[in-house]
Curated annotation (Swiss-Prot):
Sn-glycerol 3-phosphate binds at T12, R82, E83, Y134, D243. Pathway: Polyol metabolism; glycerol degradation via glycerol kinase pathway; sn-glycerol 3-phosphate from glycerol: step 1/1. HAMAP family: Glycerol_kin. GO terms for molecular function: ATP binding; glycerol kinase activity. Keywords: ATP-binding, Glycerol metabolism, Kinase, Nucleotide-binding, Transferase. ATP binds at T12, T13, S14, T265, G308, Q312, G409. Key enzyme in the regulation of glycerol uptake and metabolism. Catalyzes the phosphorylation of glycerol to yield sn-glycerol 3-phosphate. Glycerol binds at R82, E83, Y134, D243, Q244. Its EC number is 2.7.1.30. This is Glycerol kinase. ADP binds at T12, R16, T265, G308, G409, N413.
Amino acid sequence: MANYILSLDQGTTSSRAILFTREGDIKQIAQKEFTQIYPQPGWVEHNANEIFDTQSYVMRECLQFAGVDASDVAAIGITNQRETTVVWDKKTGAPIHNAIVWQDRRTAGFCDELKAKGLADVIRQKTGLVIDAYFSGTKVRWILDNVPGAREKADKGELLFGTIDSWLIWNLTKGAVHVTDESNASRTLLFNINTGAWDDELLAIIGVPAAMLPRVSKSSEVVGEIHPEFLGKALPIAGNAGDQQAATYGNACLKEGMAKNTYGTGCFMLMNTGKAPRPSNNNLLTTMAWATPSGRYFALEGSVFIAGAVVQWLRDGLGIIQSAPEVEQLALSVPDNGGVFLVPAFAGLGAPHWDQYARGAMVGITRGATKAHIARAALESIALQTLDIMDCMQKDAGIKLDTLRADGGATRNNLLMQFQADVLGVPVERPMVTETTALGAAYLAGLAVGFWKSEEEIAAMWQLDRRFEPNMAQSDRDKLLHDWQRAVARSKAWIEA
């Protein structure tokens, strides 16, 4: 009997493979960063071949470092940066353009055209999404319109589109399987979350031929096998979900009303709303959570584009710190932000503002401001953006959160977690296993092959590492929020369309 599940966690800045035990513990992690490509301001690309090469490399390295043979792996689960778009040649398997990343803003003008045509309501009703350059559909259209001959080839069925999960599965199966799951499909602007299928009207609006699209599977389902050349054995690919949905599952937010926030490159709060889509009146997204044999589940989501990436900027852009972990000690060297607020709208503002033309702003700077105040303001911006979303989520769901589960790399920062609890006014729980994105993909894969028997078994494995209790006076919280909202207002509509 196999003893492990292997998760492939394809993120925005690195590809990782994580081996999980039957108890849901981490046996081994392998990670490799890849190149970020910025052709011009507001554009972000990845080399799709480099993504696959790094992912297949860490997949092998993970098992090698663990001393585990592929025959001891029951299944593979995949989770991925969502919305990032690849278009490739069906015959050769070669991408016709770099992958356009979820952060990329080049299609903002086309999104404005769709809004001007009065299409926002029909798109929201069918997809649960807002019209924004964030989502995959407009990125596909851009590639077809800007790569010579691409649209003609797409119309003939010679090109394929996929989010990163589709691209990985296509390559791992040597072109035998072209598939995505409902959670990833629901992030394209092309998928009707009510019918659970690609939508002809949406395809016509965006301008994407149906022949390019992958089959849509459940999130927990055997969709194919990886080719034996990769690990020496054909293993079932049995779980697949976008990173934030996978993190919600991995954090065992399996009951209606439970919520988690993932602190990664961006920040993403999801609340499980059960088996019915919950429309948002506060500029949040209604999205698929996952589809399993027990049914189709939905979530409310608030997406923050820049969270952990602001710490990368402190390191790589400003040189304030040499490594990401240093930011906590630097920020702790001052008692507060000194009146400095940083709005990291480097790629516009996501929920609940949805301002494609906002840009980063730092306000409240005096001669007494230091790099420590800037570091503290950067960390606080992550928590304050999360507060904006939680307020909207509680209104939409009609549920007052009593606890927020947190995951992702930045949760290791105790200052950030405590400040988050302080400004939210509710406890923040950090799980023992913070790699919940990969864990969620593992759970979905394990369920599909009987490695785990039920969601009740999975929920019982969740373990608390630390609970951060709120410890801030309401008056202080109100003042912070007031000044934060003033700072956000100054970042909006900075680019003149």
